Design a protein with these regions (language model features):
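Acidic/histidine-rich catalytic neighborhood of metal-dependent amide-processing enzymes
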Residues: 126-198
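Histidine-centered active-site/metal-ligand motif
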Residues: 95, 209-210
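Oligomerization/assembly interface segments of phage tail-like spikes and tubes
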Residues: 112, 197-202
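Acidic-enriched catalytic cores of C-N bond-cleaving enzymes acting on peptides and small amides
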Residues: 210-222
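Acidic/His- and Gly-rich active-site-bordering loop/insert found
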Residues: 1-118
Length: 222
């Protein structure tokens, strides 16, 4: 059984609550990435913000382009804990962006701790996973453990609308022997997913007056 000190638990909790306070919806992930970079820089062998070129929006696998969108202040974050050269490399991936609050959720970015559970926008998807990786990095440093292979940590933008942040890292040529993607899964290991295909569908009908529908063609029926 792995025992975690109260100091480490408190550090992880504080990081999670601070991340929840940062409203990192699409296009506004920069402050969260910079905050996390500052926290991880002294704990890793390399930690840097990776700028995303706006040219990524021309990639055939890019999802949901928005006219006028820019990545000027939405970098990915990459951190590395170097291995001892005796094992395989692993990339850990999770995301910093969150779904915008629903109507009426006035305090979505105000974290609440209740009976050992932290509530707030992104606590489950996926800032809790960010905190989990932070805990892993803290424990490696505390116990002076050098992993067999390099551990690379990607904290990406724009997962919620198709995975554009991860796409940008892949296009940089990032490679490893294995990848672990952290998402809410009820503690189940999911070795594969069905994926997704985005497409636009146009169906044409023929309009008609409600008093004379004999010649109309319903696009919905087609």
């Amino acid at each position: 059984m792995l025992l975690i000190s109260s100091e480490t638990k408190n550090a992880v909790r504080d990081l999670l609550m601070e991340l929840i306070r940062i409203p990192s919806v699409r296009g506004h992930e920069g402050p969260a990435a910079r905050y996390l970079c500052d926290r991880l820089l002294p704990l890793t062998d390399r930690c840097e913000l990776i700028a995303i070129d706006d040219a990524i929006m021309q990639d055939p696998d890019y999802a949901f382009p928005i006219p006028g969108h820019s990545y000027r202040d939405t970098p990915n974050l990459e951190c590395v804990v170097g291995g001892n050269g005796r094992g395989r490399s692993v990339v850990f991936n999770t995301h910093l962006d969150v779904v915008p609050p629903s109507e009426g959720q006035a305090h979505a970015f105000d974290p609440i701790e209740e009976s050992g559970t932290i509530w707030g926008r992104g606590a489950c998807d996926a800032k809790g996973q960010v905190a989990t990786l932070y805990a892993l990095i803290l424990l490696l440093r505390e116990r002076r453990v050098r992993p067999p292979g390099d551990l690379t940590f990607h904290f990406v933008v724009e997962e919620e609308n198709g995975g554009n942040g991860t796409l940008a890292m892949i296009r940089r040529g990032v490679r490893a022997d294995a990848a672990v993607v952290l998402e809410p899964s009820e503690m189940c290991i999911i070795p594969a997913v069905r994926g997704a295909v985005w497409f636009d569908l146009k169906v044409f009908g023929r309009a008609a007056h409600s008093g004379n529908v004999a010649g109309r063609i319903s696009a919905l029926d087609k």
